């Protein structure tokens, strides 16, 4: 029996959540920003409610992709450094995911979208319906298509509408 698998690009979603909620910056009593944490889980829970997946996997980048930089030296050259207020929130997001028993996949030198692309391809070949939750507009062009047509992309934008 086929399953519905929700794959989440953790870095993309945390970034999207952070910038979408900057106008209402939330902090703990000790001064740690939590708006990306709040937004990330708001997006995730809304998607779970809408899609009712059988399995959820979240992938994170833990370093830059040397492979992509070797292919294209200007890869991510124009991007700004990740704000410290956002960087401090990644461990919190990961810890909460672990507490919910949601698998986290990350590998040094391999970006989250490449990890999820490989998982999508493998699970798609099994006939599973794959939903990739990402805010990365280039995702479709950089992700290898699975063997089946059961691949769907969702953006986080609707989670912050209203």
Placement of each model-derived feature along the sequence:
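Serine-biased, low-complexity intrinsically disordered segments, primarily in secretory-pathway proteins
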Residues: 145-162
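Noncatalytic, basic helical substrate-engagement surface that gates or grips nucleic-acid strands
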Residues: 2-133, 139-143
């Amino acid at each position: 029996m086929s399953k519905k698998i929700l794959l989440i690009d953790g870095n993309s979603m945390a970034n999207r959540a952070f910038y979408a909620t900057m106008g209402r910056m939330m902090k703990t009593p000790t001064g740690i920003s939590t708006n990306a944490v709040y937004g990330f889980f708001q997006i995730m829970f809304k998607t779970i409610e809408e899609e009712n997946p059988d399995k959820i996997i979240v992938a994170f980048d833990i370093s830059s992709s040397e492979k992509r930089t070797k292919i294209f030296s200007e890869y991510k050259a124009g991007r700004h450094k990740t704000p410290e207020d956002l960087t401090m929130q990644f461990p919190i997001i990961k810890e909460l995911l672990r507490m919910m028993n949601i698998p986290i996949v990350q590998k040094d030198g391999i970006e989250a979208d490449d990890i999820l692309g490989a998982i999508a391809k493998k699970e798609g070949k099994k006939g599973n319906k794959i939903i990739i939750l990402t805010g990365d507009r280039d995702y479709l062009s950089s992700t290898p298509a699975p063997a089946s047509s059961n691949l769907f992309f969702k953006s986080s934008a609707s989670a912050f509408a209203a």
